[in-house]
Amino acid sequence: MPRIAALPDHLVNQIAAGEVVERPANALKEIVENSIDAGATAIDVELDGGGIRLIRVSDNGSGIHPDDIELALHRHATSKIKTLNDLEHVASMGFRGEGLASIASVSRLTLTSRQEDSSHATQVKAEDGKLSSPTAAAHPVGTTIEAAELFFNTPARRKFLKSENTEYAHCATMLERLALAHPHIAFSLKRDGKPVFKLPAQSLHERIAAIVGDDFQTASLEIDSGNGALRLYGAIAKPTFAKGKTDKQYCFVNHRFVRDKVMLHAVKQAYRDVLHNALTPAFVLFLDLPPEAVDVNVHPTKTEIRFRDSRQVHQLVFHTLNKALADTRADLTESVSNAGEVLHDITGVTPAPMPSENDSENLFDSASDYPTGNKPDTRNAFGSSGKTAPMPYQAARAPQQHSLSLRESRAAMNTYAELYKKTDDIDLELSRLEQARFGNMPSETPIPKTDTPLSDGIPSQSELPPLGFAIAQLLGIYILAQAEDSLLLIDMHAAAERVNYEKMKRQRQENGKLQSQRLLIPVTFAASHEECAALADYAETLAGFGLELSDMGGNTLAVRAVPAMLGKADVVSLAKDVLGELAQVGSSQTIEEHENHILATMSCHGSVRAGRQLTLPEMNALLRDMENTPRSNQCNHGRPTWVKLTLKELDALFLRGQ
């Protein structure tokens, strides 16, 4: 066996480069982070050949002292930390002193820098790990680093690179993340000499729109919440904006882009009730916390981190997002800037347990209780009142033809409302009788009567319900409603499904079980062996869901009681679906974790079906329930429950004013 020998510095640098510089995007990240740490307010990036042929980064930062310029290309040489205590409280983007040395060992690197009090710049070159002597050069205050012919001396590594287009895409994505994390810095990018983008110093709100897109901005909810020394802010997309890709998911911890399973798990748990199928949410989240509360020295790329109190982080992220999403109802969506209520006003809502270190990338499959945290402080990251800006209208110009004034529209609505109130007493009484007989009303209570007629005076905007009044039922599927200045279409099954689901969740949380209603005559049905086994194993669990079944022998089961609020649902289909869910889930712990999924299945059975004719009182009762139900903008599967056509959009359809 050969004798042990110390490796030469050049080989050590190339080994380190294998960890730090996997591709051009990693080299770009290291260089740009140095510019950020230097206090630059403008950073210009040029890429040739996807960053393989050339990466050039210029900044207007503080520059490097002429006596230190050679030292900057040595391993473990840095100005950012000096003691172990500095490492535990690191606030800079870089601190390891490996980035430039690693890049210099696998490229032809040129470093030119000038400080404000210097008469000229100083330049040094490195090739194959060998440094040239510093020379004077012309350069404004700041630093320019050029890394040419990446991996020219390690052909095996270069073979693993993808096409120039692919490598460029990784570089552009990396630069966008850095620009998003530092909106106060101006960024520009050129590709093969052609400008790609130029971002001025902006507010966070403007930078999110520039990087993530205006479509995300108009479909997002602003959040700004805190808990002790932790602060969470940014924007999350409404569930209807969810996509099948994860390209619009950004997590930043102390302005550093990270891939953290704790934060990602909390986000997924917050969205679990409102996402459809395999769709994923879009979000831009910033978490600020003391540097000593997070360890960024886990991996050389610094995208993996470790929180000192991961449970507190999980709580803050989950409860903040859950609160924001719960408020998306009846066109009353606002940003969550009332942070003091976030961790205390969510009754009975608990996230799933955090993933362990060995968890896989699929983080959907767990749920458990967490204690609530302390009442947090309130700050708004966007410098506004916290209100979400209304979605801008992009259709036709304002109509020029005569239309009803707002006062005339209200008067017309009042006339309708008064007629509706006087002529529908019989319908209301019939619907009450129907509810008593079948229990199939979307709401548990009829519309409350008021002593003040709706036509007494012109109502103000605040007196009109957000979803307006029902006008008619379309095709046995949709409810047509008129609001203050718009026409609404409501999917009655999807809406009733969400209302029933939230009611059942609330009843389970308050009482520990669903109230059941015994059937006068039990309903029997033929069951499979798996369904019979599920009944034998989980009879007590079924009782908690308001279902009472008994085994009659011969693979025959009898349904003796069903949840009271599900009315005249198909009890056999309901029982078979719930038994099927229990048979698939397995252990009692997993059943508890999948409770909401079982409730969602049950609510679907108890909701009004397409084709059923509703009376006006029933339709209006459903609208009022929607206005008071969390997450009522989406059904349990993430589909929208209603859409709005404004007066301007209706005018545009008929070319009014064009």
From Swiss-Prot:
Keywords per UniProt: DNA damage, DNA repair
Keyword Protease: no
One Gene Ontology MF term: ATP binding
InterPro entries named among the record's database cross-references: DNA_mismatch_repair_CS, DNA_mismatch_repair_MutL, DNA_mismatch_S5_2-like, HATPase_C_sf, MutL/Mlh/PMS, MutL/Mlh/Pms-like, MutL_C, MutL_C_dimsub
GO CC term, one of those recorded: mismatch repair complex
Keyword Hydrolase included in the entry's annotation: no
Amino acid composition bias (Basic and acidic residues), ranges on this chain: 114-130
GO biological process entries: mismatch repair
Region (Disordered): 114-137, 369-391
Family as reported in the entry's similarity comment: Belongs to the DNA mismatch repair MutL/HexB family.
NCBIfam families documented for this protein: mutl (TIGR00585), PRK00095.1-2 (NF000949)
Main function: This protein is involved in the repair of mismatches in DNA. It is required for dam-dependent methyl-directed DNA mismatch repair. May act as a 'molecular matchmaker', a protein that promotes the formation of a stable complex between two or more DNA-binding proteins in an ATP-dependent manner without itself being part of a final effector complex.
Protein name: DNA mismatch repair protein MutL
Species of the source: Neisseria meningitidis serogroup C (strain 053442)
Higher taxonomy: Bacteria, Pseudomonadati, Pseudomonadota, Betaproteobacteria, Neisseriales
Gene name of the encoded protein: mutL
